[in-house]
Amino acid sequence: MIMFLYSSFSMILFILGLFCFVSNRKHLLSMLLSLEFIVLILFFMLFIYLNLMNYENYFSMMFLTFSVCEGALGLSILVSMIRTHGNDYFQSFSIM
């Protein structure tokens, strides 16, 4: 029963994060924040699943490492875009 509650809650949050990602396409920073929210929910789902099945949590640490690298790469693209174009509008991103 508790697993059903965890999975349904995390799926609702995942769908909410996807909706925020699709609806906030004006600024790159808001898109990056919604992507980080989605990654956080995926980490929560992975952590619950690994603890339920009594597996080791090393894979979740690798997942966190890759998600931090993804966040740093996104922020570096954001800084580069602001330096070259002066704003973070996603419509001007297609010019590159």
Curated annotation (Swiss-Prot):
GO biological process terms, semicolon-separated: ATP synthesis coupled electron transport
Catalysed reaction, written as an equation: a ubiquinone + NADH + 5 H(+)(in) = a ubiquinol + NAD(+) + 4 H(+)(out)
Tagged with keyword ATP-binding: no
Pfam family, one: Oxidored_q2
Subcellular location: Mitochondrion membrane
Keyword Zinc: no
Protein name: NADH-ubiquinone oxidoreductase chain 4L
Protein's organism: Drosophila nasuta F (Fruit fly)
